[in-house]
Regions:
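Structural signal for the N-terminal portions of transmembrane helices
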Residues: 124-128, 200-203, 259-277
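Hydrophobic alpha-helical transmembrane segments in multi-pass integral membrane proteins
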Residues: 182-186, 244-258
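Membrane-interface capping segments at transmembrane-helix boundaries
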Residues: 223, 286-296
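Membrane-embedded transport module
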Residues: 1-32, 47, 54-226
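Membrane-interface helix termini and inter-helical loops of multi-pass transporters
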Residues: 191-197, 255-263
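Alpha-helical transmembrane segments
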Residues: 214-218, 280-289
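Cytoplasmic-side transmembrane-helix entry/capping segments in multi-pass membrane proteins
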Residues: 229-238
Length: 296
């Protein structure tokens, strides 16, 4: 009964270690146990994360999931911080990629069902450009984002909750549907009809919104539930300026227009594209703000 209030155990035996690990696991805790002697192997095997000392016995090392090569307990804190940061980045990366994938799948599915531009809302080269040249930079931003200052005060994640849990899938779908909707809106609100043979403002605007929406959306999705627009942000903006320039060049420069079958846009058309591109990050930040408030 006193286990939650106890923080230090003295003169414990290997049997005590095993019992403590089982009791804490029964409470739903994630347990890490350290040891160096042969008789510590049972407790290390029982724990969720068995940590053997680098100077410990070979039997203990075999039973452990991790070996503390420098025998310094402070290294465990560094390892936990790094592990949490890596996991958060993986979650953010999957969220970003799945949202982008859902948006394109929905776009082509709806275009095929309703006969929008013969089922080809974006040219194949546009899709390849978005997938391999535009989205790579938001991914770099996600992977290079520093760990939040409070990462070590957060409770351990539930190991039973997978990456593709129902809540995450709904989040991917929500963000993907929003991005799909604004791309489709750009296609339908353009002053002309899309075409599969000549450059039009419709396909050009849809291409711009798909690119800018993915870029700004990636900035917002780099952290969760913290705001993606909070500092530090200068490095992220530097990386994201590259795909922004590439998107503008693809629409406004002559030889790129011939390559991607795009045409230059007017000022009002650019303003509409920017407004539509801002919808996804607004939805993302609103979703995160609601979850932060409900968690208080």
């Amino acid at each position: 009964a006193a286990l939650p209030e106890l923080h230090v155990f003295g003169r414990v035996t290997p049997e005590d270690k095993l019992r403590i690990a089982r009791l804490m696991q029964a409470r739903g805790d994630v347990v890490a146990m350290t040891g160096d002697a042969v008789n510590d192997a049972a407790a290390l095997k029982q724990a969720d994360i068995g940590v053997a000392m680098g100077s410990g016995s070979e039997v203990t090392k075999q039973a452990a999931k991790m070996i503390l090569t420098d025998d310094r307990f402070g290294t465990l804190v560094t390892a936990i911080k790094l592990g949490r940061s890596i996991y958060d980045k993986i979650v953010s990366y999957v969220r970003y990629q799945m949202s982008s994938l859902f948006s394109l799948v929905l776009l082509f599915l709806v275009a095929s069902i309703f006969g929008i531009n013969d089922g080809v809302p974006l040219t194949p080269l546009m899709v390849l450009f978005l997938s391999f040249f535009i989205t790579v930079f938001p991914v770099i931003v996600i992977m290079s984002d520093p760990a939040p200052s409070d990462i070590m005060t957060q409770p351990p994640r539930d190991p039973a909750v997978t990456l593709a849990n129902p809540r995450s899938v709904l989040q991917w779908l929500l963000y993907g549907v929003v991005l799909f909707a604004v791309i489709l809106a750009a296609l339908l609100l353009a002053p002309d009809e899309p075409s599969t043979t000549v450059a039009t403002a419709a396909t050009s605007m849809a291409f711009v919104v798909a690119g800018l929406g993915s870029i700004i959306g990636g900035l917002a999705m780099r952290r969760d539930p913290l705001s993606g627009f909070a500092a530090p942000i200068v490095g992220a903006l530097g990386w994201l300026s590259i795909p922004v320039v590439l998107t503008v060049v693809s629409v406004e420069v002559g030889f790129m227009q011939d390559l991607f079958m795009t045409q230059g846009l007017t000022g009002p058309q650019w303003m509409l594209c920017l407004a539509l591109s801002a919808v996804l990050p607004v939805v993302i930040e609103g979703d995160k703000a609601i979850r932060r408030r409900s968690a208080r």
